[in-house]
């Protein structure tokens, strides 16, 4: 009977973006929507997704393979959701309270999330808050 490999699955949301992260023991490869992380064109997005790996250290990041699937929302919302899912997966994979504490001190939203949503547009207005100017005379 073959030994089943350990797979950790986590889920995260940011604004309208949703991300699922699958972590398995491996060689340190990270894929976002089946594209290697190294060839993602926007450097800001690439660095944001890499933050949990850099904080975890070379030993942990080189011993796992991560596949992140992101959908919905905009580019930075997707990056934040992917970062959060990856950080949660690394904490779950290692079972380390120290790593969890490092993430909380660095940026609490890596684990806890950010519940803010965009405010919806109201009727007879141009946007959520903007309205026609009122004239008194």
Curated annotation (Swiss-Prot):
The keyword Repeat does not apply. GO terms for cellular component: cytosolic small ribosomal subunit. Keywords: Ribonucleoprotein, Ribosomal protein. One of its GO terms (biological process) is translation. InterPro entries: Ribosomal_Su5_D2-typ_SF (IPR020568), Ribosomal_uS9 (IPR000754), Ribosomal_uS9_archaeal (IPR019958), Ribosomal_uS9_CS (IPR020574), Ribsml_uS5_D2-typ_fold_subgr (IPR014721). Signal peptide: none annotated. Gene3D superfamilies: 3.30.230.10. GO terms for molecular function: RNA binding; structural constituent of ribosome. Pfam families: Ribosomal_S9. Belongs to the universal ribosomal protein uS9 family. NCBIfam families: PRK00474.1 (NF001749), uS9_arch (TIGR03627). This is Small ribosomal subunit protein uS9.
